[in-house]
UniProtKB/Swiss-Prot annotation:
Glycans are attached at N115, N203. Residues 32-230 form the PNPLA domain. InterPro entries: Acyl_Trfase/lysoPLipase, PNPLA_dom. It is found in: Vacuole. Residues 361-385 form a coiled coil. The keyword Hydrolase applies. It is an enzyme of class 3 (hydrolase). Keywords: Coiled coil, Glycoprotein, Hydrolase, Lipid degradation, Lipid metabolism, Plant defense, Signal, Storage protein, Vacuole. Pfam families: Patatin (PF01734). Its EC number is 3.1.1.-. It comes from the Eukaryota. This is Patatin-13. Tuber.
Length: 387
């Protein structure tokens, strides 16, 4: 009798623990962040196609889309463009693009976006007309409030010298941020020296004209918008019950996937103090932006990794990044077919690489694990909503 009682107690404890685990999973807030990097957006495009494919298999639903699984999707520059593609609704109120459409999009439009060189030394390298034309044609009059999930797309206003973050949650207090997604796409990708800044206007709650003078979102968040995306999620937690589990910065209840566009292994070659002692403005201009972006991206990853590890939730954060780009693949604006094919190979090879030196788990395996969590969480939320 005592043995039977002990077994029953053990079974009860296991069931209680399992139930608690699944309840916790159902309350998790999920965030996807995509870096900037121009044509190198092909790399996260490959990763997203793999992830969405896994979700479709697990849920036996060919129409499953990333926006169905993530509470917040954020991006800057080319990552902002991808964010708009997978969150903007089509005529059937489903995402304009599936993840499998991302890479073909770059192959079709990339050569035109990066082919209209102005040839001016004292002006932007490209005129930006095609970069503006494509979002206008594809996304039309769709605005931020219509996004199928929360978004976090960054830009920088050169007139006010302030970052501008386009999110659905800000619209109640700042309705002027309800801009057209096509304007946002150009603005977040308008990298200084590459494309002209973008001007457009919206209306305030009083009907007054509100003007924007915007450039690339990387100026506001540098290339990695992961912290921005998490910040948007935590701010929503104060008002939205669906985000309540991450109030007070409870990162244990946060599932974060951050996708990079690759770093330049050649740039990782060090410079000595003696070598740079006589550098002038021109020499520093050639490397200072890369240094700043690389350092900021590294520190963002370092901070997030540290926070999740300290909370014993390191499996809740995955940074997918290729750190050994070489040759033409390092260039944000080389949209030649040969280079784009190389970027596809980089993305496909990255899936087979280990997540870290200390772990045998590959990115492919880690993404499958993430997909399982996303799938289970979605089912739990759906079941809860049905009661």
């Amino acid at each position: 009798m005592a043995t039977t009682k002990s077994v029953l107690v053990l079974i009860f404890m296991i069931l209680a623990t399992t139930s608690s685990t699944f309840a916790t999973l159902g309350e998790m807030v999920t965030v996807l962040s995509v870096d900037g990097g121009g044509i190198k957006g092909i790399i996260p495009g490959i990763i997203l196609e793999f992830l969405e494919g896994q979700l479709q298999k697990m849920d036996n639903n060919a129409d499953a889309r990333l926006a169905d699984y993530f509470d917040v999707i954020g991006g800057t520059s080319t990552g902002g463009l991808l964010t708009a593609m997978i969150t903007t609704p089509n005529e059937n109120n489903r995402p304009f693009a599936a993840a499998k459409d991302i890479v073909p999009f770059y192959f079709q439009h990339g050569p035109h976006i990066f082919n209209s060189s102005t040839g001016q030394f004292f002006g932007p390298k490209y005129d930006g007309k095609y970069l503006m034309q494509v979002p206008q044609e594809k996304l039309g009059e769709t605005r931020v409030h219509q996004a199928l999930t929360e978004v976090a797309i960054s830009s920088f206003d050169i007139k006010t010298n302030k970052p501008v973050i386009f999110t659905k949650s800000n619209l109640a207090k700042s309705p002027e941020l309800d801009a057209k997604m096509s304007d946002i796409c150009y603005s977040t990708a308008a990298a200084p020296t590459y494309f002209p800044p973008h001007y457009f206007a919206t209306n305030t709650s009083n009907g007054d004209k509100y003007e924007f003078n915007l450039v690339d979102g990387a100026v506001a968040t540098v290339a990695d918008p992961a912290l921005l995306s998490v910040s948007v999620a935590t701010r929503r937690a104060e008002e939205d019950p669906a985000f309540a589990s991450i109030r007070s910065l409870n990162y244990k209840q946060l599932l974060l996937l951050s996708l990079g566009t690759g770093t330049n292994s050649e740039f990782d070659k060090t410079h000595t103090a003696q070598e740079t002692a006589k550098w002038g403005a021109l020499q520093w201009m050639l490397v200072i932006q890369q240094m700043t972006e690389a350092a900021s991206s590294y520190m963002t990853d370092y901070y997030l990794s540290t926070v999740f590890q300290d909370l014993h939730s390191q499996n809740n954060y995955l940074r997918v990044q290729e750190n050994a780009l070489t040759g033409t693949t390092t260039k944000a604006d080389d949209a030649s077919e040969a280079n784009m094919e190389l970027l596809v190979q980089v993305g496909e090879t990255l899936l087979k690489k280990p997540v870290s030196k200390d772990s045998p788990e590959t990115y492919e395996e880690a993404l499958k694990r993430f997909a399982k969590l996303l799938s289970d969480r979605k089912k739990l939320r759906a079941n809860k909503a049905s009661y």
